């Protein structure tokens, strides 16, 4: 990525903040007055399972590119760079700067965007997060909060369980309360983003079969709305569970949202319709993303728009239609021209 972007004459920052963890930030034009930011993440998830084609082969078959990260989101990153290349190759004057942000560790702990926040100030009029949306215009996504919930007991020999306190039994009661709370959360709705949700994802407890467990831990995630964060959900959970469990924040990724009639949505709809010939679909991104680093952290109106289907992300036989990638390039070119290229005189 660095080599490609430097080859376009862009001012490139290569930030290897950890071994094999790299952010690439590239600028064309005035970096203090940016018209549009185009974002992608460079990392992918693991490749367990039996694949039709080798997962890192990038096999082209049936008009699709197959492989891990093809949809999430190597195709989006490639389309961003191809679009910037096309715009700069045209030689038109820029009225505002263009910024490309490619980060590491989105799939894990968001270290790349956290590093970006620490090291880089960005002021811009618009941002496109090139996550896989099937070229639909996504105005935002719910936030992602997660927690460790821990119960404590007293270990003893399992032949006399009443001599101790079984932390797994305590956790079983906690989980029943969480199931009821999760049902309650589905009644909390946002017109654009749907309902809140809560799910128990993992459980660990006990060290030996013949020992009453003194400790049990689960991991819980909740999807939340703009203006909410992990501390608020933590407080609700702790009040619900009282002394039965300890609630510790694991992660906190804020929601991102722009109005459906905002300028960036209207502009994206026009560009998608122009390129594809179809009426653009406007909806929400069903998963989580790092869009809030730009919309909330930098105050930039931000949408999600990219090739590929999020429904195939993280799955065996992930793939993306080549036509969607080609259309994405043209859509990004159109967006860049509207936000950053000077009009012909």
Where are these regions (language model features)?
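Metal-dependent amide/peptide-bond hydrolase catalytic core
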Residues: 139, 148-345
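N-terminal helical capping/dimerization or prosegment-like subdomains
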Residues: 1-47, 215-219, 232-240, 322-327
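Acidic-glycine-rich active-site phosphate/pyrophosphate-binding loop
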Residues: 45-61, 124, 139-150, 270, ...
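Acidic/histidine-rich catalytic neighborhood of metal-dependent amide-processing enzymes
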Residues: 73-146, 190, 344
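Short acidic loop-to-helix transition motifs that present clustered carboxylates
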Residues: 19-22, 109, 134, 287-290
């Amino acid at each position: 990525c660095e080599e490609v972007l430097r080859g376009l004459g862009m001012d490139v920052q290569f930030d290897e903040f950890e071994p094999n963890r790299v952010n690439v930030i590239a600028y064309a034009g005035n970096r203090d007055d940016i018209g549009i930011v185009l974002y992608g993440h460079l990392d992918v998830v693991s490749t367990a399972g039996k694949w039709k084609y080798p997962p890192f082969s990038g096999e082209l078959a049936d008009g699709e590119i197959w492989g891990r990260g093809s949809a999430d989101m190597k195709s989006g990153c490639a389309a961003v760079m191809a679009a910037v290349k096309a715009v700069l190759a045209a030689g038109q004057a820029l009225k505002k700067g263009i910024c490309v942000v490619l980060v590491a560790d989105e799939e894990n702990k968001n270290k790349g965007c956290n590093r970006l926040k620490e090291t880089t100030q960005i002021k811009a009029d618009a941002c496109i997060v090139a996550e896989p949306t099937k070229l639909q215009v996504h105005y935002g996504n719910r936030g992602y909060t997660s927690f460790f919930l821990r119960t404590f007991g007293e270990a003893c020999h399992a032949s006399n369980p009443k001599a101790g306190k079984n932390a797994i039994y305590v956790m079983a009661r906690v989980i029943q309360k969480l199931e009821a709370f999760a049902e309650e959360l589905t009644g909390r709705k946002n017109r654009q983003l749907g309902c809140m949700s809560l799910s128990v994802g993992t459980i660990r407890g006990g060290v030996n079969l013949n020992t009453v467990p003194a400790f049990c831990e689960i991991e819980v995630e909740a999807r939340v709305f703009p203006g909410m964060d992990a501390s608020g959900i933590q407080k609700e959970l702790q009040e619900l569970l009282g002394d039965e469990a300890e609630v510790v924040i694991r992660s906190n990724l804020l929601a991102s949202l722009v109005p459906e009639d905002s300028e960036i949505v209207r502009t994206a709809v026009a560009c998608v319709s122009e390129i594809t010939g179809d009426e653009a679909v406007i909806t929400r991104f069903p998963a989580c993303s790092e869009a809030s680093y730009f919309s909330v952290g930098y105050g930039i109106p931000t949408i999600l728009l990219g090739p590929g289907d999020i429904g195939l992300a993280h799955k065996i036989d992930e793939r993306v239609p080549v036509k969607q990638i080609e259309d994405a390039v043209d859509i990004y070119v159109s967006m860049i021209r509207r936000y950053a290229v000077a009009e012909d005189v």
